[in-house]
Amino acid sequence: TNDLVAAKIAALEGGTAAMLTSSGQAANFFALFNICECGSHIVSSSSIYGGTFNLISVTMAKMGIEVTFVAPDATEEELDAAFKENTRAVFGETIANPALTVLDIELFAKVAHKHGVPLIVDNTFPTPVNCRPIEWGADIVTHSTTKYMDGHGAAVGGAIVDSGNFDWMAHADKFPGLTTPDESYHGITYAEKFGKEGAFITKCTAQLMRDFGCIQSPQNAFILNLGLESLHVRMPRHIEHGQAV
């Protein structure tokens, strides 16, 4: 059940692989921690969900991961200035919760790729009905499926989608967790075994889901799937209501 729903969300976003998590916060944490470790640095938009802001700036700081926040409409020069030698990811939200500021995905992606790191975008608010961040350059997309995807306040959940576009082996020195043998999983090297299309999600499942257990229950995945069936009908109606207000 979980695999079917994850595959459906991957198809909606135009990705190559996906996984479900127990919540949107779990999805964001996994997406970042899958490529960051003690001593890593993250560049993040400052206009993001408060829970995610605290996750990155407070909780992950206790793990030895630091962050530099930038405005969602920062210039290329301002973005460049935020990077360090140990930067491993760039993060932002398509439309921020609750500020509703819009991220310049193309620019953030351009700068992230210039520095050899992926752009992770939380696409909860627009959903792939209104925006597909991968088409604008994002490498990893996350969701709190609790919101519009479920649509009925019935099931908490999250999702991570990999675009399959980021070449981990081309930046092997930055991402040893993906490009060197995993001693906890029979010495497998994810980027070699699964390629850029499947390495990120496979590692996230085999390592983080195994160790942290933030899995979405099959019953919640079943409920989420029901919500996805009407997503294409509900989102235009939400937009109509917003425009009327």
Label the model's feature ranges.
Residues 17-245:
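Conserved PLP-enzyme active-site core in the AAT-like
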Residues 14:
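Portal/gating segments that form or line small-molecule/metal binding sites
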Residues 1-11:
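Conserved PLP-binding active-site segment in aminotransferase class I/II-type PLP enzymes
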